[in-house]
């Protein structure tokens, strides 16, 4: 978390990343709001299960419940960043793209067994760094 820049980098954590989300700026109160399905939950307004992290201010899109689907969203986000960097004529890009942004994604062992994770490795044109604990 120390090397990530919330609000600049794009963050796609999975449900076990509570400590990471706290370190990046999700507050304990916001986590509480998510756990009780409160309409003031910044991730999804109480429409998602707890621990489906998301926060607009931190560039952390809301996640789906299906295991591994956020892998595809993360690669799409990374490819959009590559296009924004290559095509300065894209309108409305201010605030959406930073030249040094990265896209962070984490998945668990179960997620690596899903076909979506394999497809991500196969289609990603942006650099992909896989780290195993």
Regions found by a protein language model. Give the residues of each.
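Cofactor-binding active-site loop characterized by glycine-rich and histidine/acidic residues
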Residues: 1-132
């Amino acid at each position: 978390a120390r090397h990530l820049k919330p609000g600049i980098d794009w963050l796609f954590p999975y449900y076990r990343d509570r400590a990471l989300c706290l370190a990046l700026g999700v507050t304990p109160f916001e986590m509480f709001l998510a756990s009780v399905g409160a309409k003031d939950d910044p991730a999804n307004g109480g429409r998602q299960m707890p621990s489906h992290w998301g926060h607009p201010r931190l560039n952390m899109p809301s996640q789906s419940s299906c295991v591994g689907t956020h892998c595809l969203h993360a690669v799409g986000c990374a490819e959009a960043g590559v296009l924004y960097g290559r095509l300065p004529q894209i309108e409305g890009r201010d605030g959406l793209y930073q030249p040094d942004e990265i896209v962070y994604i984490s998945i668990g062992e179960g997620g690596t067994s899903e076909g979506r994770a394999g497809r991500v490795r196969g289609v990603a044109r942006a650099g992909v760094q896989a780290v195993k604990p």
